[in-house]
Amino acid sequence: MAITDWPEGERPREKLRAAGAMALSDAELLAIFLRTGVAGKSAVDLARELLKRFSSLNGIFAASAEEICQVHGMGLSKFVQLQAIFEMSRRALLEQMQGRDVLTSPQAVRQYLSLRIGALPREVFIGIFLDAQHRVLAVEELFSGTLTQTSVYPREVVKCALRHNAAAMIFAHNHPSGVPEPSQADRALTEALKAALNLIDIRVLDHFVVAGNQLVSFSERGLI
């Protein structure tokens, strides 16, 4: 049944106007952006299928164009729409961090990192470059690797930090395995980065390991 044939109070757009966006399920919100379904499948049905296949909204946003287009009813146009939504969300969260001390807004940092790298199928390592007041200067993806290993070169990180005139840094990388527990290699890397950056008086404030919506902070664990 097409959404236009549903009772008015159950249609996602009308429901949002009446009760606000918080009242909608993930599938209903997604359906608003998808706009249309296909024969025999409403936009809500299509949204539910995407959520089932990719497990979460983050999983959908991290999926490639090829993976999205394998779902009947999805095409490049809808993939582009989803990527635009994702990028707007990332930029909105980045705006929340900019212009303020990130140490006083840890939730914004966590949300941003989870959205940016939490669902990626490959391991990536990013740096958040901060000024002396711990305000965000830039966020960069520094390195990427396979599902099990990332090659990170402290010398290259130092070059980036100097280019941004950073006074402090926060690092983050994801574990595609879904387990955010820091490994011995993660700890060794953090120590190497701390030592290299200490030579140019740049502090490492934290290193987050991200897996989906789960994050582990080195600082909170007393590992930094």
UniProtKB/Swiss-Prot annotation:
A motif (JAMM motif) lies at residues 173-186. The keyword Metal-binding applies. Pfam families: RadC, UPF0758_N. InterPro entries: MPN, RadC_JAB, RuvA_2-like, UPF0758, UPF0758_CS, UPF0758_N. It comes from the Bacteria. Gene3D superfamilies: 5' to 3' exonuclease, C-terminal subdomain, Cytidine Deaminase, domain 2. SUPFAM superfamilies: JAB1/MPN domain (SSF102712), RuvA domain 2-like (SSF47781). Keywords: Hydrolase, Metal-binding, Metalloprotease, Protease, Zinc. Zn(2+) binds at residues 173, 175, 186. GO terms for biological process: proteolysis. Residues 102-224 form the MPN domain. One of its GO terms (molecular function) is metal ion binding. CDD domains: MPN_DUF2466. NCBIfam families: PRK00024.1, radc. Belongs to the UPF0758 family. This is UPF0758 protein Mfla_0315. The lineage of its organism: Bacteria, Pseudomonadati, Pseudomonadota, Betaproteobacteria, Nitrosomonadales.
